[in-house]
């Protein structure tokens, strides 16, 4: 048993470290972009479109990354995706033009799809019993890094070249860790694509969970900094509050595998959706920053829990050779939500509690749907 653990650790250590470094850089960049638009002579109204362009790229990338990963392997696919992402950041600085920024963020989304498909399928390979724990480690690294990145807004700021230099430096460290770190990986070409018939038989609650995760997280990443700024919160506290959202997402990850032992995954998504509804309701009732901080942390727990639960539900009892394809389908579903989320949420941004109202309605509908599906699934089990 000890020898097995010794083999497993280096296999996941390198991609997790690289993901953590990427997450710090990406988390910082996500807040810098909407806040720094005026610095580059661009209008604040571009923020939602830039966010949607990124997630449109994620959607496109989700459809095309499986063959690349199978052809060149997980390590090189990860490195290539990071290098393309670095290129898109440099383009933003050199060409401060709205159309070029939209194109650059579209390409950035495609490259990030490569990162997600690569790391998720890398960690989902292996024994099924430890899959939830590996996904928890993946999500914890992703969200923990993103939370640290959000703090960069207050510590480093958003002006000048230092933020961009810091972001690119972190991404280069991620590239070097993949180039020189020791790890094994799933064999290239060792996966099959799911047919349309097989995709249609994937768990519907898992697909909806991924879509809602995109609808909520896309809006949070793209518009929450502006929502907080519109409330009169200063820039340093905006970064801290965004970090709290992501820390909530990080804190919930160890809870998900543990709760999955006792509760069905569909019911679990309903419970976390209800937690988000309650947290958002409190932001309507109490306006002070302390209450806002606590409830943003709870909102982070609720929204960031949905994706790992959904993807684990989708891959439950799935043959190993279909895992890359299944993660691509789940990422595609997430991306659909992520593209629509910022644009739909932007329609309510001019109203009081605009973004919060959008998130409230999204999570309330999800809670009701998941409860219905949970009861339906339990009845089917009892009748069989």
Model regions: which residues?
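Helix-loop boundary and gating motifs at the non-cytosolic
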Residues: 6-55, 203-206, 218-231, 238
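Paired small-residue
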Residues: 99-107, 290-298
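C-terminal membrane-cytosol helix-exit motif in multi-pass small-molecule transporters
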Residues: 153-157, 167-189, 369-374
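Cytoplasmic helix-loop-helix junction between adjacent transmembrane helices
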Residues: 104-140
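Helix-to-loop junctions at the C-terminal end of transmembrane segments
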Residues: 61-74, 157, 252-264, 349
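Structural signature of the two symmetry-related core transmembrane helices
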Residues: 76-90, 168, 267-281, 360
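Intracellular juxtamembrane helix-capping segments at the cytosolic ends
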Residues: 114-127, 304-318
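A late C-terminal transmembrane helix in Major Facilitator Superfamily
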Residues: 320-351
